[in-house]
A protein has these predicted regions:
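N-terminal accessory/capping or targeting/presequence segment of soluble
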Residues: 1-107, 114, 118-160
Length: 160
């Protein structure tokens, strides 16, 4: 929990430096795999949530984690005391990530992602969402080389 609070603050400092108001951090790698090498567990590092499914959204003042029903209990336990709120992806009255952003990001705000971690379709949808809501969309935000000092290197193992 202590590291999560520290990691969230490091991310927020990088956001301020880059003039980013919100960032989406998926739990996937550039191949859209839910089961990633340690190098790509960026959402885990920021939120403390270690389940294989989940998306984090962080603003300068709030943070949320969206996950499916397989991980509701785990997420509640791992997020306790971190300042990250759990939202249910499938069921209940919780907002979607974009509904939450529409309520928590001011017009003209910058929503940023690391474009390597999103498919063209996902990025296009986010770009359209931003346009409809008066937000700016950036796909080149990757603060982790600077803020995640002990991040594991990319694996060099053969795929097959």
């Amino acid at each position: 929990m202590k590291d999560t609070v520290k990691n969230l603050e490091a991310l927020r400092q990088a956001m301020r430096k880059s003039h980013v108001d919100a960032v989406i951090i998926p739990g996937t790698d550039p191949h859209q795999s839910e089961y990633t090498s340690a190098h790509w567990k960026l959402r885990d590092w920021v939120t403390g949530f270690t389940g294989s499914n989940g998306t984090a959204v962080v603003t300068l003042t709030d943070a949320g984690l969206w996950t499916d029903s397989r991980y509701f209990l785990q997420a509640e336990q791992e997020l306790e005391g971190t300042g990250v709120t759990m939202y249910k992806e499938d069921g209940g009255n919780d907002p979607t990530t974009t509904e939450w952003l529409a309520e928590n990001l001011e017009e003209g705000g910058v929503l940023a992602v690391n474009g390597l971690l999103f498919s063209v379709v996902q990025a296009s949808r986010l770009e359209a969402f931003c346009g409809e809501n008066g937000f700016r969309f950036a796909t080149d935000f990757d603060p982790f080389p600077e803020i995640y000092a002990d991040r594991q290197a990319l694996p060099l193992d053969k795929v097959f």
